[in-house]
């Protein structure tokens, strides 16, 4: 997992408008239930419009940004210039060289990003560890050469943060269509040991209720019996970080469940609340 790109949501609006300066009744396009729920809570006066299509097609819905659809023409009959703004992911726009269309990079404290937003994951098949490692890199290479090569680009802090975010999502039995946000980060904690912090939100689709939690876990210092061995100390720290990240994500999810997040309409699948309460029916 390479280093994370900008995890924030991006407002792309006409005339340089921001979330705070969009006029009452402004039409804002997004295809994300998470963004819809938070926008309804933040700016209930806005008109939210469900949109689909690639990045260029979505930008073409905003006056002044239609030119970015020149090399990817919109489908016949697709609206153009009918919205005041659209919300996309900063990371995607940055990677496409379209950062200049962003009129506001929305603070995660204002709009919590999706779990894993801005992060990329590289996967290989188990059998490729031997086949590619030997056939492509070096016919005489030992099994696991490709895996070792990929580890060189792995950013531990990003990997740990995304592990925590996805642990929360998994515990809530939710997917990308649920109005759930989570952002974690690794910081310097006490006595030189790292701390993992997480801010997360779960909302009703209509924005009528937004649950928000911030929590953290402080790791212990590296044990004295391995502190003198850099390799052993690093291995201990890595193992401890991932275990703590998983536990933090589950802990925050459990807090949401205790608050009734699984009972919010259109939010997450019914999960075991541990109190004998019935689970709501799964949404269609």
Regions found by a protein language model. Give the residues of each.
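Small-molecule-sensing regulatory modules
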Residues: 45, 49-284
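A conserved helix-loop-strand patch within extracytoplasmic ligand-binding domains
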Residues: 1-45, 129
